[in-house]
Curated annotation (Swiss-Prot):
Gene3D superfamilies: Aspartate Aminotransferase, domain 1, Type I PLP-dependent aspartate aminotransferase-like (Major domain). This is Glycine dehydrogenase (decarboxylating). One of its GO terms (biological process) is glycine decarboxylation via glycine cleavage system. It comes from Mycolicibacterium paratuberculosis (strain ATCC BAA-968 / K-10). The lineage of its organism: Bacteria, Bacillati, Actinomycetota, Actinomycetes, Mycobacteriales. GO terms for cellular component: cytosol; glycine cleavage complex.
Length: 941
């Protein structure tokens, strides 16, 4: 175990004495003995003579927090923070310090998980409902989701949504030529495997001939032009096509919104609402539709329902659309969204209100008008919002260089055109410097009135009551207090790896040298960032045993998708494009099947044994049956059942022998680092979750980073980008070349500070804690799956099905009751219905792990009282959970259990009390009565 003065000792919860105590309960004498019993010998890495795991010897020795931050400061100072007037979907913004301090830098917000337990997630859900209301108001559409990964993927989702919703049979999509290049490229990526034909044209002239299921255009366009798309919308509808507009939300405070001109879908980004550019991300994309398309929306959708006392409460609505339920029939493969950034954007809108946003928009437009007035006839478009396109015949490079000399980056369109984008941070001095670069004198602006919007927006009190810093600070605290995040309790969610997100790892993400970089800035501005990215890629290669890594995918789902596209393109390059069968075990996460479907593959399910392992005979039969068309096997390792399958090498060999590729889902990599490398035991490609194994916080449901790691033969097919020729020539999956680059310093810092020994110790400790929980709880809740030697990996599944059958107490009852004990529930009913999957991670102390076990054992005692008939099935502390303070102080208490049993089942000194803000929520009511925007204040009376 690491010395107590190291960062690793701060990150890893149990000290050596605690680890020894847990190992004693497990029945092994050392961590190495535990690894030998749990991890199959055939794949387990052997330590070198000096005790270092293979691959990890390529990592630098561990640095202290001070040393790592000093190195990061050096990388940051190598960058140049120029004034960005590049635009193209990314704009500088002024983040209110009250939001920076109370959201982005606040662990109560950034360490939470996706709000699957809504009763203890009401703060986040309210903030996300504000986000949905903000987007719906500004776009003029009824329903928005919360949220998308970025603008480009939102456009791709808009395309597939329109195809699902279209009544016609056409497979053609019309895309306007003035759509952002990165957006058009991502749409093309998504269209290709789905058999969608894209027709790119200047749609100001109307739709081209032929049938289309959908149309995509931009408002304003990439050139800055504001086009009235009403005629195009009408024409498209007459011909049976739906229309999606990529709309700038700040511009929509002034111009007519998409919904008012009849558009069916609006998509875009909320980045300029207080979220730094961050060299490309993370930012919250958005997608809004008319109400009749609500069930076609991808991703998370927050709705209003009622709790057990009839009070309004929030929850995730219409979850049957999503990948974790519908698998390959889901509306999307998206799992992680961008919750933390959506909260930032929503609170930015709340802080400024409609009047403030409109004033910002007018100021931005005013600066653009000043530039246009000076340029005169060189301006290409008459109507624009923030971006001025100028003709400079043969002088583009000269103008760009002159601006650069003045500390400003402009956008070179071609030899003869330069684009200038203004934003919230633009000043009069910036405008003057731009005019000098063009060699023109200031002129009196001529008003180009673009304010055609008449509809009100952001009228709900959520956007009018919090204009002072005091009010906003208290609002954010009130919301945070309604949730359970890692700052209050362990979150033992299986398959989610809710480990520590250390303050030292988080600190650099707000440094301007990282945060204020445009993703298309000149490479000369970002050498430090590029070196950081190179370091992280090399370290991940060393850890995983692969040969190349792309950091572009901004979620695990996108990493999966990128990996499957690389496999498809590899087969095609060898003259085998017909290989389209993807084998997936029945136990797999739903994202696997959804990603395979999006990649144009046909999913064939492989059976599993009763012990959770892949049925090797069934696999071989399926491989033989589909040998000529076999593309891929997707398999999670360790398995989704929380064990190390001993047949993994044979499984990989069977697929390779048939010409297929093996996709090892890296969701559970926290159980492998320093112990085994997927790139060495049979994997051809994996996605990794930096927001699990490598400490990027979950943010309440995003951001995430899902790098894709490959063997050398797949490296040429990794994601490329239209504005990054240095990348491979594969197809882009994210709007920015390096995805959510501004949070990569978190994982860089984690690896740099842990070092080889610390990383291996983290995996071993995670396995130890999981096996300790399995031993302590097996007597009360049988552990469903173990490996050959009776061991689990880094998580264990508790089987409640016999308990439910005998007593009527459900897994839902236990999950809700845990909130009364102060804990977030483990993962419910995945991968097996009626079970709980527990993953403690290495960061939790033995004291916290024991408290969780004590709570579970006490709950089993309550279940036994129900089973014995002491409490009715329909009226007991479990079925009544969670209990609010309000329900306990009512005059009438007609339950067979006491108020003290309800609120303090293990006494008042057990742990700090968490008061759930609402009772159990009626999910079915919320889906039947869909409300996805802020409810009126009267609803809470």
């Amino acid at each position: 175990m690491p010395d107590h003065t190291t960062f690793a000792a701060r990150h890893i919860g149990p000290d050596p004495q605690a680890v020894a105590a847990m190992l004693d309960v497990i029945g092994v004498g050392s961590l190495d003995e535990l690894a030998a019993k749990a991890v199959p010998a055939g794949i387990r890495d052997r330590l070198s003579a000096d005790g270092i795991a293979p691959g990890l010897d390529r990592l630098p020795p561990p640095a202290s927090e001070t040393e790592a931050l000093a190195e990061l400061r050096g990388l940051a100072e190598a960058n140049t923070v120029a004034v960005s007037m590049i635009g193209q979907g990314y704009y500088d913004t002024l983040t209110p310090p009250v939001l920076l301090r109370n959201i982005l830098e606040n662990p109560a917000w950034y360490t939470a998980y996706t709000p699957y337990q809504p009763e203890i997630s009401q703060g986040r859900l309210e903030a996300l409902l504000n986000f949905q209301t903000m987007v719906a108001d500004l776009t003029g559409l009824e329903i928005a989701n919360a949220s998308m990964l970025d603008e480009g993927t939102a456009a791709a989702e808009a395309m597939t949504l329109m195809r699902r919703a279209s009544r016609g049979k056409s497979n053609r999509l019309a895309v306007d030529a003035d759509v952002f290049a990165q957006t058009a490229a991502i749409v093309a990526t998504r269209a290709r495997p789905l058999g969608i034909e894209i027709v790119t044209a200047d749609l100001r002239d109307g739709l081209p001939d032929g049938d289309f299921f959908g149309v995509i255009a931009q408002l304003p366009g990439a050139s800055g032009a504001i086009t009235d798309w009403a005629a195009l919308v009408a024409q498209a509808h007459e011909r049976g096509a739906l229309v999606a507009l990529g709309a700038d939300l700040l511009a929509l405070t002034l111009i007519t919104p998409p919904g008012e001109i009849g558009a069916d879908v609006a998509f875009g980004t909320t980045q300029r609402f207080g979220v730094p550019m961050g060299f490309g991300g993370p930012h919250a994309g958005y997608l809004a539709v008319h109400a009749n398309h609500a069930r076609q929306l991808p991703g998370r959708l927050v709705g209003v329902s009622l709790d057990a006392d009839g009070s309004p409460a929030y929850r995730l609505a219409l979850q049957t659309r999503e990948q974790h339920i519908r698998r390959d029939k889901a509306t999307s493969n998206i799992c992680t969204a961008q919750v933390l950034l959506a909260v930032m954007a929503a609170m930015y809108a709340s802080y400024h209100g409609a009047e403030g946003l409109t004033a910002i928009a007018r100021r931005v437009h005013g600066h653009a008008e000043a530039i246009a007035a000076a340029l005169g006839t060189a301006v290409v478009h008459d109507r624009y919002f923030d971006t001025v396109l100028a003709r400079v015949p043969g002088r583009a490079d000269e103008v760009i260089a002159a601006a650069k000399a003045r500390g400003i980056n402009l956008w070179r369109v071609d030899d003869d055109h330069v684009s200038v984008a203004c934003d919230e941070a633009t000043t009069d001095e910036h405008v003057a410097a731009v005019l000098e670069a063009f060699g023109v004198a200031p002129a009196e602006p001529v008003a180009s009135e673009i304010a055609t919007r008449t509809a009100e927006f952001l009228t709900h009190p959520a956007f009018t009551q919090y204009r002072t810093e005091t009010a906003m600070m208290r609002y954010l605290r009130t919301l945070a207090d309604k949730d359970i995040a890692l700052d209050r309790s362990m979150i033992p969610l299986g398959s989610c790896t809710m480990k520590l997100n250390a303050a030292a790892e988080m600190e650099p993400i707000t440094w301007p040298e990282f945060a204020r970089q445009h993703p298309f800035a000149p490479a000369s501005d970002t050498p430090g960032l590029r070196r950081l990215i190179g370091d992280l890629e090399n370290w991940l290669v060393a850890i995983t045993g692969y040969d190349a890594v792309s950091l572009q995918p901004n979620a695990g789902s996108q990493g999966e998708y990128a990996g499957l596209l690389a496999i498809h393109d590899y087969h095609a390059s060898r003259g085998e494009p017909h290989r389209d069968i993807c084998l997936i075990p029945s136990s797999a996460h739903g994202t696997n099947a959804a990603s395979a479907a999006l990649a144009g593959m046909r999913v064939v399910v492989v059976g599993c044994h009763d012990n959770g392992d892949v049925d090797l005979d069934d696999l071989r039969a399926k491989v033989t049956e589909h040998r000529d068309r076999l593309s891929t096997l997707m398999i999670t390792y360790p398995s989704t059942h929380g064990v190390y399958e001993h047949d993994i090498a044979e499984i990989c060999a069977a697929v390779h022998d048939a010409g297929g590729q093996v996709y090892v889902d890296g969701a559970n990599l926290n159980a492998l680092v320093g112990l085994a490398r997927p790139g060495k035991f049979g994997g051809d490609v994996s996605h990794l979750n930096l927001h699990k194994t490598f400490c990027i916080p979950h943010g309440g449901g995003g951001p995430g980073v899902g790098p894709v790691a490959v063997r050398s033969h797949l490296a040429p097919f990794l994601p490329g980008h239209p504005h990054a020729p240095e990348l491979p020539q594969g197809h882009p999956v994210s709007s920015a070349p390096y995805g959510s680059a501004s949070i990569l310093p978190i994982s860089w810092a984690y690896i740099r500070m842990m070092g080889a020994d610390g990383l291996r110790a983290a995996s071993l400790t995670a396995i130890t804690s999981a096996n300790y929980i399995a031993r302590r709880l097996d007597e009360y809740f049988p552990v469903l799956y173990t490996g050959e030697n009776g061991m689990v990996a880094h998580e264990c599944i508790l089987d409640l099905r016999p308990i439910t059958k005998a007593t009527g107490v459900t897994v839902d009852d236990v999950a809700k009751r845990l909130a009364d004990y102060g804990f977030h529930a483990p993962t419910m009913s995945f991968p097996v219905a009626g079970t709980l999957m527990v993953e403690p991670t290495e960061s939790e102390t033995l004291t916290e792990v024991d408290a969780f076990c004590d709570a579970m054992i006490a709950i089993r005692g309550e279940i036994d009282r129900v089973g014995a008939g002491e409490w009715p099935v329909e009226d007991n502390p479990l079925r009544g959970a969670p209990h609010t303070a309000e329900c306990l102080v009512t005059t009438d208490w007609d339950h067979p259990y006491s108020r003290e049993q309800a609120a303090y089942p293990l006494g008042k000194d057990f742990r700090p009390k968490v008061w759930p803000p609402v009772r159990r929520i009626d999910g079915a009511y919320g889906d039947r009565n869909l409300v996805c925007s802020c409810p009126p204040v009267e609803a809470f009376a």
